[in-house]
């Protein structure tokens, strides 16, 4: 307490158990500071993406780790989309194999699995899904969207049409099949001379609600690791906040059972519902190596998020789920896009 009687909030939060007594006596939420910090971040940033044009030394570096006989803390899935030939496959190969492919082979459906370790020692099994940007694969591409955690939407800096297609084609598609999933806008081939203004890229990033805009070159390895380090750091930070919330929720339920339950009964009501909450663990899903069908799902409706407990910290800067007009069946989106195409008879 301060001399004038007001409460001073400590910067050290402590564990939920160590705060039980003070919480019950004063009604102070042990994670109130975390909530306020998240709200302040959202208010200050809004829809403004993090723009990375040069190398950013402040992004944590995730080092390669071995998957052999090792249990990871998290499973993460990244799906890469964009126009055909814009550099999606080269970006993935440059990251996973540390080399630039000399021969271009159009991708149909590929996925790569690797493991990385964060600076705080936690490991992440990272599944990278490559997709085909050509129109003939419009019906196959949605098979890669189930369980995606972050989307990389790519465009080539030397091709203005690929940037326009981000707004006109790729964002509507991913927003239909996986609404609310965070998007990172990636400008590839930054080693090539280009007259494209960065302002246009920033404007598109804001319009689609991207959490970041990163310029990279797979040929020179410029910012290649930065793209994935940025995605990994964003994913891990949100997962740790979710774990923190679930710990607080579990602590409150234990107190409720000791006091006889929130409904004044024996506490069976709380025990029953505590089993229904999803926890952040490796059983959330598994990524199978060298297969394209391990996450295949029925596409009769747009994908929704897992049945996690609603997070009081907000949506971490994502756009709210927008009702899609293409929810009749799985191929309504493709048919609608083809109807809009103009046919010119010469």
From Swiss-Prot:
Where are the stretches annotated Disordered?
1-25, 259-294
Motif Effector region residues?
Answer: 104-112
Asked if the keyword RNA-binding belongs to this entry, the reply reads no
Give the subcellular location. Cell membrane
Which Gene Ontology CC terms are recorded? plasma membrane
Query: Which positions are cleaved off as the propeptide during maturation?
Result: 344-346
- List residues with covalent lipid attachment of type S-geranylgeranyl cysteine: 343
Matching entries from CDD domains are given as: Rho4_like (cd04132)
Q: Extract the GO molecular function terms from the UniProt entry.
A: GTP binding; GTPase activity
Coiled-coil regions, chain positions: none
Which family is annotated?
Belongs to the small GTPase superfamily. Rho family.
Cross-referenced PANTHER family: RHO FAMILY GTPASE (PTHR24072)
What is the protein name stated in its UniProt record?
A: GTP-binding RHO-like protein
């Amino acid at each position: 307490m301060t001399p004038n009687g007001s409460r001073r909030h400590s910067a050290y939060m402590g564990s939920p158990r160590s705060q039980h007594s003070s919480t019950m006596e004063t009604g102070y939420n042990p994670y109130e500071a975390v909530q306020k910090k998240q709200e302040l971040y959202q208010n200050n940033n809004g829809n403004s993406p993090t723009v990375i044009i040069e190398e950013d030394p402040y992004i944590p570096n995730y080092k390669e780790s071995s998957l052999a006989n090792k249990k990871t803390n998290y499973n993460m899935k990244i799906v890469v989309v964009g126009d055909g030939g814009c550099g999606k496959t080269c970006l993935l190969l440059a990251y996973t194999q540390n080399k630039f492919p000399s021969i271009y082979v159009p991708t149909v459906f590929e996925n790569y699995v690797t493991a990385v370790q964060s600076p705080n020692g936690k490991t992440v099994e990272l599944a990278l899904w490559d997709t085909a940007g050509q129109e003939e694969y419009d019906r196959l591409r949605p098979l890669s969207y189930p369980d995606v955690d972050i989307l990389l939407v790519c465009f080539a800096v030397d091709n203005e049409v690929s940037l326009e297609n981000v707004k006109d084609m790729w964002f509507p598609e991913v927003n239909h099949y996986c609404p609310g999933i965070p998007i990172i806008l990636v400008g590839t081939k930054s080693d090539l001379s280009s007259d494209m203004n960065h302002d246009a890229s920033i404007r598109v990033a804001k319009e689609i609600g991207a959490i970041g805009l990163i310029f990279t070159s797979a040929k020179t390895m410029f910012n290649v690791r930065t793209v994935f380090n940025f995605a990994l750091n964003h994913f891990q930070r949100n997962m740790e906040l979710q774990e923190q919330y679930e710990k607080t929720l579990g602590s409150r339920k234990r107190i409720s059972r000791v006091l006889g339950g929130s409904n004044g009964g024996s506490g069976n009501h709380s025990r029953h519902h505590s089993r229904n909450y999803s926890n952040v663990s490796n059983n959330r899903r598994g990524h199978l190596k060298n297969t394209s069908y391990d996450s295949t799902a029925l596409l009769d409706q747009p994908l929704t998020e897992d049945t996690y407990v609603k997070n009081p910290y907000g949506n971490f800067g994502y756009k709210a789920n927008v009702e899609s007009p293409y929810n009749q069946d799985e191929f309504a989106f493709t048919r609608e896009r083809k109807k809009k195409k103009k046919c010119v008879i010469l």
